[in-house]
């Protein structure tokens, strides 16, 4: 089996690469940060093919997929993990550049990678597309605005993709985590570790390994089983009450 992972240089992506490589699965680990990828490849050995890829570059996606070595060329599982959140300001004060970057990465990047790899899966009559969504796509919160909307897109795209692929043998799963302690909050707050650490203060969040284990489980079900959606949260997280303005 061969697994293609985007955003594999850290967080969920690196954990997914490690989890599948532990089974002897071939892994194409793609990301922008080549130094991190080199370390991952050195750690995991010959079962990993590391390749530089910015999912916002459509031409690069086409080139990378076309130039995969023969032993990594037939992708069985695509894990669309690359994504980010930027800022937590209300919509009227949000930076449009941040919104554009989230849409370009979380939505357009995901569909471009999917479109590049999907024809091979359909031709072979097997495959699995695993998309990383978020509970933010279902449950709104102040400052979530564009980020939550991009993850709602991932959820709906996954369902429609499943409908399109009915009868092809290709499966589709949306994995939708809640609070997880990765670089997510550090990126959201532009490297401010104090703000990032405060997000998880006093509670036990999910880990990257928790999410990687969930993805691995979904992707290794028998071929007649399709896991449509998995929503997972830390036990300490639940659903916020509706907001009410008083006075």
Give the predicted meaning of each segment.
Residues 174-178, 193-241:
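C-terminal helical subdomain
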Residues 53-63, 96:
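The beta1-alpha1 cofactor-binding region of Rossmann-like NAD(H)/NADP(H)-dependent oxidoreductases
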Residues 114, 150:
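Active-site helix of classical SDR
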Residues 9-10:
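Conserved glycine-rich cofactor-binding loop
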Residues 23-39:
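Conserved glycine-rich Rossmann-like NAD(P)H-binding loop of the short-chain dehydrogenase/reductase
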Residues 134:
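Residue(s) in the substrate-gating loop at a strand-loop-helix junction
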Residues 89-91, 95-103:
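Substrate-binding pocket helix/loop in short-chain dehydrogenase/reductase
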């Amino acid at each position: 089996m061969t697994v293609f992972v985007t955003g594999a240089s850290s967080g969920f992506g690196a954990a997914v690469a490690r989890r599948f490589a532990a089974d002897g699965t071939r892994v194409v680990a793609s990301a922008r940060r080549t130094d991190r990828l080199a370390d991952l490849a050195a750690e995991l050995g010959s079962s990993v093919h590391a390749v530089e890829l910015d999912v916002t570059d459509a031409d690069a996606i086409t080139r990378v997929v076309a130039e995969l070595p023969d032993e990594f060329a037939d992708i069985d599982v695509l894990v669309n993990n690359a994504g980010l959140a930027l800022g937590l300001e209300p919509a009227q004060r949000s930076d449009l550049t941040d919104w554009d970057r989230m849409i370009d990465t979380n939505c357009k990047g995901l569909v471009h990678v999917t479109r590049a790899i999907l024809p091979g899966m359909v031709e072979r009559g097997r495959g699995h597309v695993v998309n990383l969504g978020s509970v933010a796509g279902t449950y709104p919160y102040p400052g979530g605005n564009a980020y939550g909307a991009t993850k709602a897109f991932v959820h709906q795209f996954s369902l429609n993709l499943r409908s399109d692929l009915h009868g092809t043998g290709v499966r589709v799963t949306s994995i939708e985590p809640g609070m997880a302690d990765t670089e997510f909050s550090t990126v959201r707050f532009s490297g401010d570790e104090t703000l990032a650490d405060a997000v998880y203060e006093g509670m036990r969040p999910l880990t990257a390994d928790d999410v990687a284990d969930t993805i691995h489980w979904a992707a290794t079900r028998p071929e007649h089983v399709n896991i449509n959606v998995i929503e997972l949260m830390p036990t300490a997280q639940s659903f916020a009450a509706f907001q009410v303005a008083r006075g």
